[in-house]
Amino acid sequence: MQGRLSAWLAKHKLAHRPLGFDYQGTETLQIKAEDWVSIAVALYVYGFNYLRSQCAYDVAPGGSLASVYHLTKINDNADQPEEVCIKVFVPREDPRIPSVLRIWKGANFQERESYDMLGIFYESHPCLKRILMPESWIGWPLRKDYIAPDFYEIQDSH
């Protein structure tokens, strides 16, 4: 089912795939990593001026990784702000997504956390380094194929 935003993107020939609506009626779209920056700029111009959250998850063991963006269109006289959920899937072997920090400043720590936990590299992020784990940590703890070190290795890493 195509929503209002999907129709607008299609009208402007911006590549995407509608994924339907969530339980609250928020439209969900899939965007390819190589198209993400141009579509992010278009969404900002369209009025999505607030990045409510960005997160990432491991779709399946050995499968792709996903970076998820929840955008909100905020204006002064909106009782119900319009929202959209964007999903960008990348292969786990080379998980690269362009950073949207220059569009939404709130992406800074959120993209860093996704990098730290899942190893998604956000290209052109000015300070992409670990934010929760020590710099010496090896691996990506929230990947489903991650093998946790034993107790003594965890103690030695601090």
UniProtKB/Swiss-Prot annotation:
GO terms for biological process: photosynthesis, light reaction. The keyword S-adenosyl-L-methionine does not apply. It holds the Pfam family Complex1_30kDa. The keyword Cytoplasm does not apply. It is a peripheral membrane protein. PROSITE patterns: COMPLEX1_30K. NDH shuttles electrons from NAD(P)H:plastoquinone, via FMN and iron-sulfur (Fe-S) centers, to quinones in the photosynthetic chain and possibly in a chloroplast respiratory chain. The immediate electron acceptor for the enzyme in this species is believed to be plastoquinone. Couples the redox reaction to proton translocation, and thus conserves the redox energy in a proton gradient. Belongs to the complex I 30 kDa subunit family. This is NAD(P)H-quinone oxidoreductase subunit J, chloroplastic. It comes from Cryptomeria japonica. The gene is ndhJ.
